[in-house]
């Protein structure tokens, strides 16, 4: 069986005799697309991968249409790490760096004084925001505690980030006791112990069915149809134009003069360039029409 068939997929599964549910996700091309236009240090790349997997696993627990933003803000050299995902498993991520970053830096050294913020935004209904202390060695451990505290359910979160066959990969598993109260703590602990034995080459390189069999071959596991995951930025010429109009006219004229009559707006997330000349900006102001581009 070709392991690549389960790249960029999210699977849900149920341990039928244990009243415990699970999720498994692996990001391959999605992770590559996210990193594509950036040259992040390895430690930042790995942190973004960890946060992306966590966001995918979080969005899979939503019982409504909407999106989740997982964000770290601090006063260290990594000022911001942000991941946004929705119920369609479309995801994007970015980081902002201000200072020197070494690959041997701990999470605390990267972030300094900071917090982890989770914002859940349903398409209908009120937004919810949770603020989590970054008081553990990894984001995964901080988020695992968040899951357990917010849902009052035993939860295991396991995330690995690295390389497989020379390409970046991020993968993770979530285990959670069912909310109906029918599961026992002993059953959960037994499955969590099995889950913790997973090797990098297994979580990175096996198809879902084979991975689950390897870990839980004595269990009855019902595996549901997967959901595809993809990188999706959502930027557009129109959005860039709207942002440009927030700048005052004198400053726009100055930028146009400095850059040979064309302003280059680059998306911070995906790196796409949007170009605006004087004519395009005037049209934006007067009519709200989509701007004319110059390349």
Swiss-Prot record:
GO biological process: protein refolding
Tree of life domain: Bacteria
SS bond list: 233-235, 267-270
Alphabetized GO MF terms: protein folding chaperone; unfolded protein binding
One cellular component (GO) term of this entry: cytoplasm
Predominant cellular place of this UniProt entry's protein: cytoplasm
Modification after translation: Under oxidizing conditions two disulfide bonds are formed involving the reactive cysteines. Under reducing conditions zinc is bound to the reactive cysteines and the protein is inactive.
Localization (cell): Cytoplasm
Transmembrane regions: none
Alphabetized UniProt keyword annotations: Chaperone, Cytoplasm, Disulfide bond, Redox-active center, Zinc
Function according to Swiss-Prot or TrEMBL: Redox regulated molecular chaperone. Protects both thermally unfolding and oxidatively damaged proteins from irreversible aggregation. Plays an important role in the bacterial defense system toward oxidative stress.
Alphabetized NCBIfam families for the sequence: PRK00114.1
Record-stated family: Belongs to the HSP33 family.
Name of this protein: 33 kDa chaperonin
Organism, as annotated: Mannheimia succiniciproducens (strain KCTC 0769BP / MBEL55E)
Protein's gene: hslO
């Amino acid at each position: 069986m070709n392991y690549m068939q389960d790249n960029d997929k999210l699977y849900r599964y149920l341990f039928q005799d244990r009243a415990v549910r699970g999720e498994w996700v692996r990001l391959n091309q999605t992770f590559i697309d996210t990193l594509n236009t950036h040259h992040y240090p390895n430690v930042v790349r790995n942190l973004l991968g960890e946060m992306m997997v966590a966001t995918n696993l979080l969005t899979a627990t939503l019982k409504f249409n909407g999106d989740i933003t997982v964000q770290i803000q601090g006063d260290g050299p990594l000022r911001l790490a942000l991941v946004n995902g929705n119920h369609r498993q479309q995801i994007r991520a970015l980081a902002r760096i201000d200072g020197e970053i070494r690959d041997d830096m701990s999470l605390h050294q990267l972030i300094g004084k900071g917090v982890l913020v989770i914002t859940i935004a349903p398409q209908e209904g009120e937004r919810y925001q949770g603020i989590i202390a970054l008081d553990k060695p990894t984001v995964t451990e901080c988020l695992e505690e968040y899951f357990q505290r917010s849902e009052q359910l035993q939860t295991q979160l396991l995330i690995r980030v690295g390389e497989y066959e020379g390409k970046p990969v991020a993968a993770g598993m979530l285990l959670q006791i069912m909310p109906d109260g029918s599961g026992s703590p002993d059953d959960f602990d037994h499955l969590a112990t099995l889950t913790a034995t997973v090797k990098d080459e297994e979580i990175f390189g096996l198809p879902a069915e084979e991975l689950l069999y390897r870990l839980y071959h004595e269990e009855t596991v019902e595996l549901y149809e997967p959901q595809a995951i993809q990188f999706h930025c959502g930027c557009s010429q129109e959005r860039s134009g709207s942002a440009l109009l927030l700048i005052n006219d004198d400053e726009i004229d100055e930028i146009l003069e400095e850059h040979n009559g064309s302003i280059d707006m680059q998306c911070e997330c995906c790196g796409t360039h949007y170009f605006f000349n004087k004519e395009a900006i005037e049209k934006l102001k007067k009519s709200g029409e989509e701007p004319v581009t110059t390349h």
